[in-house]
């Protein structure tokens, strides 16, 4: 199981160095989300669960602020809106295509906060709006654990906002019983501080590819000065190309090189065409 899972997660992590989502506009809802409803999952038909390992994947930020049918600006996704689902879909499908050959794949729709919320750089505002998103992720994970898992080992994975949700699950929702089944947690594109590592026992940094029950996390830039202010206190970083936590370079089959800059705990990627990965809408996040 280990080599097969690592093979696909290696490819997934490499892809997550660069992916992002697009812009939409549609209505929202403030009702409770019932995760026994198959419509609340990307794919709810789990009759073919024939893998020995599960993965619970939390999608990254894919929506922007939008105006609902009452003319009010909304900052959280309407998970039943078709257009918004279409914007979330590519990111979920990317993860599923990479990981479902080796894992039973579970990914809930949740009321994620908008990209506009992140662009505000207002951490208090972000935390306030994220509470609804996290409430949904908790409800989805509890339903998954009580109804789908059936005692199998599982992996937590999330990118960007999804990584934040994974980190919060590890801090507040994972019990000793659940932790016994946890293979690893992939929290890509977010931040974990030293204070958090010191305060929460299930926030354990991965040191190499053989660790279990740990967090695999990293952020990547092409220049050290491009690191987002939101990640300035991050302490967790492992290179997915060589599973090293030092500055040893890892070389991708795609031709680029990735090395950790120890002073900022961030991967610096060289040998790529920056224009292919530039996202104008998030320019404000850069210094």
What are these regions (language model features)?
Residues 19-20:
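C-terminal motif of bacterial Sec signal peptides marking the signal peptidase cleavage site
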Residues 158-162, 166:
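Gly/Ala-rich beta-loop-alpha elbow adjacent to hydrolase catalytic centers
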């Amino acid at each position: 199981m280990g080599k097969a899972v690592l093979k696909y997660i290696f490819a997934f992590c490499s892809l997550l160095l660069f992916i992002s989502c697009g812009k939409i506009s549609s209505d929202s809802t403030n009702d409770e989300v019932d995760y026994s409803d198959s419509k609340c999952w990307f794919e709810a038909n789990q009759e073919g669960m024939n893998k020995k390992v599960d993965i619970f994947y939390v999608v990254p930020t894919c929506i922007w602020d939008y105006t609902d049918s009452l003319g009010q600006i909304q900052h959280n996704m309407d998970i039943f809106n078709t257009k918004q689902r279409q914007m979330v879909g590519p990111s979920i499908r990317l993860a599923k295509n990479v990981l479902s050959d080796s894992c039973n794949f579970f990914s809930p729709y949740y009321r994620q906060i908008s990209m506009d919320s992140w662009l505000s750089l207002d951490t208090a505002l972000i935390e306030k709006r994220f509470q609804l998103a996290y409430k949904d992720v908790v409800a989805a994970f509890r339903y998954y654990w009580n109804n789908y898992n059936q005692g199998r080992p599982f992996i937590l994975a999330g990118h960007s906002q999804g990584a934040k949700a994974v980190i919060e699950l590890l801090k507040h929702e994972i019990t000793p019983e659940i932790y016994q089944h946890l293979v690893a947690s992939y929290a890509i594109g977010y931040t974990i501080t030293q204070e958090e590592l010191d305060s929460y026992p299930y926030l354990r940094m991965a040191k190499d590819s053989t660790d279990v029950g740990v967090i695999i996390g990293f952020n990547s830039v092409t220049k050290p000065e491009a690191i987002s202010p939101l990640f300035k206190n991050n302490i967790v970083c492992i290179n997915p190309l060589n599973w090293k936590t030092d500055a040893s370079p890892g070389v991708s089959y795609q031709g680029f090189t990735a090395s950790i800059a120890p002073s900022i705990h961030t991967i610096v990627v060289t040998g790529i065409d920056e224009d292919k990965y530039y996202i104008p809408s998030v320019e404000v996040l850069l210094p």
